[in-house]
Amino acid sequence: MKTKQIKNFKMNDEVYKLRTKVINLIREVKKQYRTLPRIEVRIGEARNHSVLGVARLKDNKIWITKRATDMSQDALRNVVFHEIVHAVTGFEHDEKCPLMKSTLDGYLLNKNECMKYLKKYINNNTSAAILSLQSIG
C-alpha cells in the first residue's frame, strides 16, 4: 500500500507503536460504528512537510505521518478522524467544517467534538448509510 505523498516506514517495533496509536483512535470510532470497515493504516514521512495524513477516498486506506503521531492526542485524533471521513465516505475537504478543513490550524476539536463531526459525515453519506444503522448513541 503506497501513496505519492507519504513514504512508508518499514515495520519495526517503533513503527508498530506509532501505528497502534492510530489504530486505537480508529477503535474509538468502531465503538460507535460497529460496522465500520477495516481501515488499513501505514505510518511514514511526508514528502511535503505540511502533510499530516492522506487517505484514499472510499478505499478504507489511510497514511499518517510520524509528525502527526508525535502531536498531542487531540491533534492526532483530529488528523485520524479527518482521514477516516475521507477513507470511508469519500467526502472531500470542507473549509467550513473544523474536522474536514484542509489544514490543521487554530482550534483543535476534543474527542466528543471530533466524534460529533465524524458522525455528521457518516450519517449524511448514502454509501456509508449502513454504518449509521449500527450507530450507538
Cite the ranges covered by each PLM segment.
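Metalloprotease/metallohydrolase-associated module, dominated by Zn2+-dependent proteases
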Residues: K4, K10-M71, F91-G137
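Active-site recognition of the HExxH zinc-binding catalytic motif
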Residues: N78-F91
